[in-house]
Structures are given as structure tokens and as C-alpha cells.
A protein has these predicted regions:
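Aromatic- and acidic-residue-enriched segments that line the glycan-binding/catalytic groove
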Residues: 63-67, 113-125, 129, 159-204, ...
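Structural detector of well-ordered beta-strand residues that form the stable sheet scaffold
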Residues: 104, 154, 274-276
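N-terminal structural segment of carbohydrate-active enzymes
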Residues: 1-152
């Protein structure tokens, strides 16, 4: 019932009602016919690219104050190489000539990690494009420019974990925000535990809530506030940027009940949208669990 526009969100002391903090917020207008957007399908040719390794269109963002991981092209391993949104946009005509109809970049959200930040899979802010790639508006304009050439954009989403330098880590919203109460317990990657009715509960717990690495804290989506946050975050990016689809990293590693809620929430907003999830297993019975319409 809230109309688009700017307003202040006020936070008050629950006991006294005293105003503690207020945050200026802007609610954007939805695009016309947004809910009817079409996703990608078998007819599409998808280009998967790593933005940092693709093309450097704006050398001015190679070094950003406050970001430890800078461009070093002499390091062909984990260092950043300077590719950015401007570089992708400058090559849209080339991508179009190659016959691609969808672009799937690896994650471009802020990844302010000390090292190996180029890949993007350890986000430190879920609402901000990494400034070494460009701005949120740069990203939105890239999507629009691609659409004008008949090319859609698939966003790479990470629901399972964040980076260990995410600002949440300085002051957790709640003690159960992370798997294993914020203590590093490595997942054993036992993906079959979810489909094995005889699997030990401890093994299932470890798979869904164990950390991917010690620099990628696992998110505990059994926390209802976190679950709602992630759902709203995904819908916001679809609407704000004008996305054509989602590719979800480490899909099966998140809480299974949350994944069902997340997927149904997205499809409720966008019935014709397309989403695919990463599942490493080669066993059909394990992969089948995640197919649309599968009863589990």
C-alpha cells in the first residue's frame, strides 16, 4: 500500500518508544509490465564471462580508496586484472555479432576482500555493485544497452554465503545469522545427505550450514528475518536492473525449506522468469531433487 517515493524509516526503542535512528529510503516505481518479463530458455545462446578478466573500459576504477585488492596484471592467478562494466558495454556489438542472446557474468556485487576478490563469490554488500566494476546505475545501463541489442542479462546470485569482510560481520543482526552460530565449521560437501532418507541428521546439518571456506561464512536461512532479506534483495535486483534470469551459485548448499520459499516468491512476482541453480552432482537422483515440480 506504500506509494513510490522518498520517506524515512524510523527505529524506536521497543521499551520506551524513543526515536533511536532514522534512515532515508527511496521506494522506486516498478517498470510497466515488469511482472510479465520473459526469462531465458533453450532457444538462447548464453555467454558466461568473468567481468574482471573480460575488458577494462575505465582504468580510473582500477584502484579505489578503501579497497585492498588492486589491479595487478603481472599476477595471472588471484589478482584483479581491471575488467569492468564499461569494458563489457564497449563490446556489446561484438557479443551481438557472435550470436549471443544472454550474458551471464560472474557476480559483480561489492567484494571487498583482501585477496582473490576478482571472482565475486564472497560479497561484502548485497545491494552494491563493486566500484571497481562501476556503479549500480552503470550496471542498470549495461542491462538496458544489452536489451536494445536483443541480449538479456542473467545475474549470478549467491544465497549460501557472504564474504568474511561483509559489514554484517562487525555487528551481527542476531546470534543465529550464520551457520553454527558464526563458528567456522567446514562443510563436508555431502550432497547426497539431502536425498538419503537414512542420512544422519548431523551430516545434513553440516552440509546445509557448514561454511564453504573460512572466508565465506554460511548464512543461516532458518532465521526468518535473513530469509526475507534475501528474498527481497533478489526481487529488488530483478526489478531495479531489469534482469532476464538468475543463476544461483552453490544452490543446494542453502537451507532446503528456504530455497522452496525463495523460488516460489520469485515466481509469484515473475511467473515467466527463469532460474537455474548450481548442483555439482553427477548422479541423476541427486540432481532431480531440485527440478521444478519434483516432490521432496
Amino acid at each position: 500500500s506504500v506509494r513510490p517515493g522518498s520517506f524515512k524509516i524510523r527505529f524506536r526503542d521497543q521499551a520506551t518508544g524513543r526515536l533511536r535512528y532514522q534512515y532515508p529510503y527511496r521506494l522506486l516505481q516498478r517498470e510497466p509490465q515488469s511482472a510479465q518479463r520473459k526469462g531465458f530458455g533453450a532457444q538462447d545462446v548464453i555467454l558466461n564471462l568473468v567481468p574482471d578478466r573480460f575488458a577494462n573500459g575505465n582504468p580510473d576504477n582500477d584502484r579505489i580508496a578503501g579497497y585492498a585488492d588492486h589491479v595487478d596484471r603481472s599476477d595471472d592467478g588471484g589478482a584483479r586484472h581491471g575488467g569492468d562494466i564499461a569494458g563489457i558495454r564497449a563490446h556489446l556489438d561484438y557479443i551481438q555479432r557472435m550470436g549471443y542472446t544472454m550474458i551471464w557474468p560472474t557476480p559483480m556485487l561489492e567484494n571487498n576482500m583482501p585477496r582473490y576478490s576478482y571472482h565475486g563469490y564472497a560479497a561484502t554488500d548485497l545491494y552494491r555493485i563493486d566500484p571497481r566494476f562501476g556503479s549500480n546505475e552503470d550496471y542498470r545501463q549495461l542491462v538496458q544497452a544489452a536489451r536494445q541489442r536483443g541480449i538479456g542479462m542473467i545475474q549470478d546470485v549467491v544465497l549460501n554465503h557472504i564474504g568474511s569482510h561483509h559489514w554484517w560481520m562487525q555487528d551481527m543482526p542476531s546470534p543465529d545469522w550464520l551457520g553454527f552460530q558464526g563458528k567456522f565449521v567446514a562443510t563436508r560437501h555431502a550432497r547426497t545427505t539431502l536425498s538419503d532418507r537414512y542420512a544422519a541428521a548431523a551430516d545434513r546439518e553440516n552440509f546445509s550450514y557448514g561454511w564453504f571456506t573460512d572466508t565465506m561464512p554460511d548464512l543461516n536461512q532458518r532465521n526468518p528475518v535473513l530469509a526475507t532479506y534475501q528474498i527481497q534483495n533478489t526481487i529488488w535486483w530483478i526489478e531495479y536492473a531489469g534482469l532476464s534470469g538468475l543463476r544461483v551459485d552453490t544452490y543446494s548448499y542453502s537451507d532446503p525449506a528456504f530455497l522452496a520459499r525463495w523460488s516460489s516468491s520469485i515466481l509469484r512476482e515473475y511467473p515467466h522468469f527463469s532460474m537455474v541453480g548450481e548442483e555439482w552432482s553427477t548422479q541423476p537422483l541427486v540432481v532431480a531433487r531440485w527440478l521444478r515440480g519434483y516432490r521432496n
